[in-house]
């Protein structure tokens, strides 16, 4: 069975959560919100969790995605944030 593509699994508009993992720094959560607001306007209440040693910070943010292109662009742009290791 071929692997399903993300666009085939989602029906737009839909709720979508991004999880951004990066080096623990004070501005990471603010940088994530700025990037998300550029492509998906709204008020956001991101959640963050520090790694056990405090080296990394993960920021989860929920959006209402209007189309697959918006999701794809956000994956790319969030990954460009300074110190980001991965975007899930």
Swiss-Prot record:
InterPro entries in UniProt: UPF0250_YbeD-like (IPR007454), YbeD-like_sf (IPR027471)
Superkingdom of the source species: Bacteria
Gene Ontology cellular component list: cytosol
Classification via NCBIfam families: PRK04998.1
Cited HAMAP family: UPF0250
Family: Belongs to the UPF0250 family.
Record-given protein name: UPF0250 protein PM1928
